């Protein structure tokens, strides 16, 4: 009987849940805005965790400035995480900006532009055929 989830996947899910709670309730930094954890990748030995985040930036905030502010809290967040989870070693946390949402929107816009361009060309060629048929 095989396991449905590997240990790294279970730890990854637990880390994502706990990190979301920590960021929401315990990290007080106005530079962060609203932080969403989109994914957590844990190394096989559970020593390292890549945390992918997105931000809802307000006003002067940029994703880069929010990420820099979040990275200042890495050590403190790891300490709080160590108190909440039962692992022999608390993973070293590294935060990365997750731009998949931005890239997805960009790709969607490109597809929409191509479809609209194609429709316009079809309409133009249809008008040319109508004009040729009238003559």
Swiss-Prot record:
One of its GO terms (biological process) is maturation of SSU-rRNA. Residues 115-135 are annotated as: Disordered. Disulfide bonds: none annotated. Residues 116-135 have a biased composition (Basic and acidic residues). It is found in: Cytoplasm. InterPro entries: KH_dom-like_a/b, RbfA, RbfA_dom_sf, Ribosome-bd_factorA_CS. GO terms for molecular function: ribosomal small subunit binding. GO terms for cellular component: cytosol. Its main location: cytoplasm. SUPFAM superfamilies: Ribosome-binding factor A, RbfA. Pfam families: RBFA. It comes from the Bacteria. Keywords: Cytoplasm, Ribosome biogenesis. One of several proteins that assist in the late maturation steps of the functional core of the 30S ribosomal subunit. Associates with free 30S ribosomal subunits (but not with 30S subunits that are part of 70S ribosomes or polysomes). Required for efficient processing of 16S rRNA. May interact with the 5'-terminal helix region of 16S rRNA. Belongs to the RbfA family. NCBIfam families: rbfA. Monomer. Binds 30S ribosomal subunits, but not 50S ribosomal subunits or 70S ribosomes. HAMAP family: RbfA. This is Ribosome-binding factor A. It comes from Vibrio campbellii (strain ATCC BAA-1116).
């Amino acid at each position: 009987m095989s396991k449905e989830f590997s240990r790294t996947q279970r730890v990854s899910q637990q880390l994502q849940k706990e990190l979301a709670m920590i960021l929401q309730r315990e990290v007080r930094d106005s530079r962060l805005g609203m932080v969403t954890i989109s994914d957590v990748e844990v190394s096989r030995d559970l020593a390292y965790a890549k945390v992918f985040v997105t931000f809802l930036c307000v006003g002067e905030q940029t994703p880069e400035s929010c990420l820099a502010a979040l990275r200042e809290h890495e050590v403190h967040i790891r300490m709080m995480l160590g108190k909440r989870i039962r692992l022999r070693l608390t993973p070293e946390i590294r935060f990365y900006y997750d731009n998949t949402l931005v890239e997805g929107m960009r790709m969607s816009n490109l597809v929409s532009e191509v479809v609209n361009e194609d429709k316009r060309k079809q309409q133009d060629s249809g008008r040319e055929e109508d004009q040729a048929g009238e003559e």
